[in-house]
Swiss-Prot record:
Primary location recorded for the protein, binned into one broad class: secreted
Compartments (UniProt record): Secreted
Family matches, as Gene3D superfamilies: Pancreatic trypsin inhibitor Kunitz domain (4.10.410.10)
Gene Ontology terms, MF aspect: potassium channel regulator activity; serine-type endopeptidase inhibitor activity; toxin activity
The protein's name: Kunitz-type kappaPI-theraphotoxin-Hs1c
Site (Reactive bond for trypsin): 47-48
Functional summary from the UniProt entry: Serine protease inhibitor that inhibits trypsin (Ki=0.281 nM), kallikrein (Ki=337 nM), and chymotrypsin.
Intrachain S-S bonds: 37-85, 46-68, 60-81
Site (May bind Kv1.x/KCNA): 39
Keywords linked to the UniProt accession: Disulfide bond, Protease inhibitor, Secreted, Serine protease inhibitor, Signal
Occurrences of domain BPTI/Kunitz inhibitor (ranges): 37-85
């Protein structure tokens, strides 16, 4: 592979990064944080049974969390869920 092709590939990847990076930053983010309240409930991959709360788009609802994995849309109490996710 010639130097011209390598430089062209580097230039292409650099432009692609500059164009797509702002979109990646703004998708599902609020105040610079990932908007975990928009994620679905996720039990995780383990088999434990912890009662947690998640935001379903309208309100906070209970779900059973397996104890590991999952995502950030899980809260130990309804109050914590509402504080983080409910819109005033």
């Amino acid at each position: 592979m010639g130097i011209a092709r390598i430089l062209s590939a580097v230039l292409f990847l650099s432009v692609l990064f500059v164009v797509t990076f702002p979109a990646l930053l703004s998708a599902d983010h609020h105040d610079g944080r990932i908007d975990t309240c928009r994620l679905p409930s996720d039990r995780g991959r383990c088999k434990a049974s912890f009662e947690c709360w998640y935001f379903n788009g309208r309100t906070c609802a209970k779900f059973i969390y397996g104890g590991c994995g999952g995502n950030g849309n899980k809260f130990p109490t309804q109050e914590a869920c509402m504080k983080r996710c409910a819109k005033a």
